[in-house]
Amino acid sequence: MKGVDDAFLGVGDKPGLDIWCIMGSNLIAIEKSLHGKFYTGNTYIILSTVELKSGVRQHNVHYWVGEEAKEEDCLTASDKAIELDVALGSNTVQYRETQGEESDKFLSYFKPCIIPIQGSLSSHMRIYGDKSKDTTMFRCEGEHVARVTEVPFSRSSLDHKAVFVVDTESKIFLFSGCNSSMQTRAKALDVVKHLKENRHCGRCEIATIEDGKLVGDSDAGDFWNLFGGYAPIPRDVQDTVMTELMTTSSKKLFWINKRNLVPVETNLLEREMLNSDRNYILDCGTEVFLWMGMTTLVSERRTSVTALEDYVRCEGRQSNARSVILTEGHETVEFKMHFQHWPKNAVPKLYEAGREKVAAIFKHQGYDVTEIPEDKPRHFISCNGSLKVWLVDNGSVTLLCTEEQEQLYNGDCYIIRYSYIEDGKDYHLFFAWSGLNSINEDRVAAASLMSGMIDSVKGHAVVAQVFEGREPEMFFLVFKSLIIFKGGRSMAYKNFVSQRSDANGWYQKNGVALFRVQGLKHDCIRAIQVDLAASSLNSSHCYILQAGGSFFTWLGSLSSPSDHNLLDRMMDKLCPLKQSLLVREGSEPDRFWEALGGRSEYLREKQVKDWPADPHLYTCHFEQGLFKAKEVFSFSQDDLVTEEILILDCVEELHIWVGHQSGVLSKEQALDIGKMFLQAGIHQDGRRPIDTTMYIVTEGDEPRFFTSFFNWDYSKQTMLGNSFERKLAILKGISQKLETPERSLRKSSSSSLPRRSPGTSSSEPTTPEQRAAARTFASASTGKLLRERSPAALSPSLSTPSPSPRSRSSASSSPASWNSTPSTVARRLFPPSLHASAEAVATGTPRRR
């Protein structure tokens, strides 16, 4: 390829890393066994290739600059990164990484850590590792990736906010500053393990020192003797430069005209401001983006990269502002979030396109292929469990009989409990299902009553909040057969309808109704009543039309034979004694259209299935009263630390994992944090619907459908203590007594255990930031928790009920009283009366309606 280095030809075809070192104008490929070993006097280019579930390859290019690297090597690296982008079709994202200020994404490639080696690499030498026996000292920061910096071996290098590792000939000391988080201390133990295995061949002692702890600790005495005796450490000084960059809200946009920056005057950033024939610089404080239009020349892009580096250098921010270079059409979420209403990308449906190509090949070779078998979903839940369904009505629940639990109404809310045995353990999966037309009062009651039911079961409980139209496949799996009718049976919904005098569309046994039939072959089947109109039809689906005493089964022209089989099975469920008239699309009789109110246009195009989304893990916290979420790259089970709450984002559903020491006091609060995450629009092109399915998974209660996202080690699931104590026990080979701690969030919140030091095992908050987290999560609220599309929002009489003891007790929990940011006063998110009544009615007797 013209203008591209030969070293880049054919790269990026396989997932993994490719690394080159800049040697003058040449590129020296680094073999796999030496990945992660960087010299301070060199510059490197790193290509990360990831194959997404869609089959698309994602490329990230990083060029790493050592603190002693030559200026000409840095310029060569930026030019070579542009060449690599061209070789890969101009669809990469490029990051400039400076030694000591690397991004979390970059550091995640080289877990547990990278420790740059002094000097430079020549093309005639090999790296055998640092064999020096001299005492070295490292500063460790970071909670999910270790940010390691070698510092002078001196007492003056110590401070209270970081963790330090001192590596001597016979012993490795870990010193934890009193203001360091438990997660940082635990992550620093990974560095200790790395040094022990690579510098000491696994043979050395490990000592942990706590800042300020001296009495009766021989290891502390040995540690301070290295520095000539103990002396107080000065107080930490705040980094005002970084704080100013992080708190600034102003953004600067420039377009590049022959290395000159021309400001774009605007108050709000819009996508339309970026022209495809220009390159732009967007300065966002801690990050500086270079956006390159798709029609710009390679020479213009190289000039723009130089302009970017000049800009950062002139601003004096080489060390604290990260440069990100991207091409039009391949923008990162972090970049798009700075703009108002960024349009969603129209990406090709490679998942379905590949299946169609396979079918075409078989047909060309003479095979009679009527249908390529669809991918069977992975079931990480037993389908042989027991099901119970409760109707939420007037602040209480009523257990439905077996015949009725497979018939839901879209004006009601239900609590579903599915109990099953997995690996010899009892699991209970709770769903709070809200119908499309259900009212806010029932929705709030369902979430609260479900939390009360959890305490009445033994075993491992997982909670899910589900809304009609957004249900996960697992919801339908537990039913196996389900019919959703229009209408409702709760008193609140009936009152709402009577006030509006609108009961049209309610299902009547001998009336007229249209049902869309879908399913997963023999695993589960569902029929959903839709609007009685021809516009509700879809060529990709099958339908049942009930017209009084007559039934039609309508086959869409794009539906499959398996869909037709599901249709026959649903007819047996819906009307077992009736014979239906089979109607194929395009040959409908007149009375079919008459029952639908006449002909009209409907969707006739093939509905292709999106590929499974790649999961992303985020850690959540509050910063100055504002909700923050940060992605954890290359995540593993070890990233689920007990002091945190993490969200596994699978796009169509969220798994909210709650650690025992996270400070989250109830499952309602965990749902509240999930809604904050959705409203923030993290990882997506704008905000997602608030009715996205959310699972609440408590530490120790992880079901298989959650652990399947990780390479799960069940022995870690039952360990006690904080994250530092657990990792230290593994490192020292100490076998813990494995017990099952209290799983209920609400029960653990009432614990009155005395406060303990970090060296003892307890779920009580032990550090200042843990206690602050507990206070923060206790007072956090979402703002608008309930869906805006609920019909109750349209009815003033329901949003402001008449005074009564019950309504007065729940007034403080109304949506109008919730703020968008945490307040200093803790408040209950749901009415306490609902919590109190839940256990009393959870085991009620079935009632037939």
Curated annotation (Swiss-Prot):
GO biological process terms, semicolon-separated: actin filament capping; actin filament organization
One MF term in the entry's GO annotations: actin filament binding
Signal sequence, renumbered to the chain: none
Region (Disordered): 739-849
Domain of life: Eukaryota
Primary location recorded for the protein, binned into one broad class: cytoplasm
Keyword Repeat: yes
Keyword Cytoplasm carried by entry: yes
InterPro entries named among the record's database cross-references: ADF-H/Gelsolin-like_dom_sf, Gelsolin-like_dom, Villin/Gelsolin
Keyword annotations from UniProtKB, A to Z: Actin capping, Actin-binding, Calcium, Cytoplasm, Cytoskeleton, Repeat
Pfam families in the record: Gelsolin (PF00626)
Single GO cellular component term: actin filament bundle
Subcellular location: Cytoplasm, Cytoskeleton
Tissues expressing the protein: Expressed in roots, young leaves, and inflorescences, mostly in the vasculature of roots, leaves, and filaments of the anthers. Also detected in guard cells.
Gelsolin-like repeat placement: 30-107, 147-213, 262-335, 405-475, 527-566
Biased composition range(s): Low complexity: 747-782, 791-823
Family membership: Belongs to the villin/gelsolin family.
Function: Ca(2+)-independent actin-binding protein. Binds actin microfilaments (MFs). Involved in actin filament bundling, severing and capping. Caps the barbed end of actin filaments and protects them from disassembly. Promotes VLN3-mediated MF severing.
Record protein name field: Villin-1
Organism: Oryza sativa subsp. japonica (Rice)
Primary gene name: VLN1
